[in-house]
Amino acid sequence: MSEPKASPAREVWITGIGLATSLGEGLDANWEALNARRINVDEKTFAPCIVHPWMPVNFDTQIAKKGDQRQMEAWQRIGTYAAGLALDSAGVKGNKEILGGMDMVIAAAGGERDLAVDIAILNAAAKGNSDPGFLNERLMNGLRPTLFLAQLSNLLAGNIAIVHGVSGTSRTFMGEEAASVDAARIALARIAAGQSDIALIGSAYNGERLDLLMLYEFGGFNLKDGFVPVWARQNNPGFALGSAGAFLVIESKAHAQARGAKPYARLTNVVADLAQRTQPGAVTRSLEALWNKLGVHDGNGALITGATGAEPVTSEEKAFLRQHANFAVRATGTMFGQTLEAQFPLGLALAALSISHGALFPPNDPTGLEVEMSKPPTQIVVVGAGHWQGEGMALVEAIE
């Protein structure tokens, strides 16, 4: 008896993009800023640390109810807002039939904190004023009830469902940069296999938080004492946190065509790895192995990376990039900062946007690693190497 033949994988298109970043709101604002080589950094508020602050928006345009806005913390508002932009871009905003079957596969961090309560508890403990019931009393009476909602990672998806009506299946991944790689990988695999027709993928990050800066300072990851582009940080390694929301709508070619949707690009493949970074060169080897699995072909290619500027991962990624010098490189960390879970979907968004414009945005790098690309890119590889663990790669291609 012959084995049944497996169905061919379905083609998957990117049909919607939502961006709200330190460079602005929407695709036009971000594209214009990239082409103007504009960078928005704040070197004073959190000095000596540096952040890429979120560009203020009118939340009412995507989150109509003030009550919904109040029960979210900043990272959830950023994400819910950017998700709405992606749905608008895809032409499905308010379409209950499509939204009712739209799946969500997103990445999220662990929520935000009330710094005033944290500081009061720590100060009391330092002065010896914390009796056995003090901590519970402060947590019960000092925290507003809605803060507990902001602590739940899966409530980013919950808020998107409530505000925008996206009510298919929902999956939330945690794990910094690697989480968003897996979110994209699994969403793509499900659509390609016929288990899903359309999905919303992405993440959001609020980098303007003292508690996060403190945590990354413990690891020696923060860029301090002046901004320089990612590739020029050898003598002062580290990353500048950035605030951003990046979401995409991806769907099968057949589903998109049936509703008359115009694609930005094709999402061809997403692959992931978790290198054991105990030996020098582990990241270089991991990225090369992913490249070989990706299906990159000869032609006009570019490479958009979420390189952080932290070491030793950035130097090891550079070694990989030098092996593929025929691909024009762009580092999102220079323009947008390190946006953790949002870094990989940001790269996907910029890749699709570049392909749809028929041009790669210009380099913003004094070292010469990034070079001009005169021809329209037909394929863009998106690279995500986490600042301390996790590697991922995606292939975004033009649709002929």
Predicted features, each with a name:
Residues 1-169, 173-174, 181, 189-193, ...:
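Conserved "HGTGT" condensation-loop signature of ketosynthase/thiolase-family condensing enzymes
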